[in-house]
């Protein structure tokens, strides 16, 4: 059998994304409580994200257009988010409230992300993201963590989380996620 890499590139990227998802899932979490949400996206659903990002650029942030172009050059996206409403219960005050009890009474709102959020849950999100992209680097798959992708996917209802980051994946001759000029 002969297989040209171009014929199985998308399958390879999907396998990498699935392994990345499991690395994010098994990453250490505060008190061992898992509030991480992970969704794999490819094909037509990616185009919906890119279109939503272009729509959001009309609000003034033209870098949504640049990042939408990156989405279109990708073979898949991994959405990784966290629910920040569950506290760890240590009253650390990093959220800006005197106690976890006060935090729980706060109105949770936000146009792009929902907050306030427990700082430990956001740390957990960062660790999960780091674990995922570590795997992509080990596997030779290009990625970049992008919050604009997360916002668009959240607005489209693709993931149930308060804060979401998008991790596009690509296996091209050159990474499409660097040397990107800001849009004007």
From Swiss-Prot:
InterPro entries assigned: 4Fe-4S_dom, DUF2148, Nitroreductase-like
Positions that bind [4Fe-4S] cluster: 92, 95, 100, 118
Keyword Iron: yes
A Gene Ontology molecular function term of the record: oxidoreductase activity
Coiled coil regions in record: none
Domain of life assignment: Archaea
Keywords from the UniProt entry: 4Fe-4S, Iron, Iron-sulfur, Metal-binding
Cystine residue pairs: none
Cofactor(s) required, per the database record: [4Fe-4S] cluster
Domain 4Fe-4S: 72-135
Cofactor binding comment, as recorded: Binds 1 [4Fe-4S] cluster.
Protein name per the record: Uncharacterized protein AF_2201
Lineage per the UniProt record: Archaea, Methanobacteriati, Methanobacteriota, Archaeoglobi, Archaeoglobales
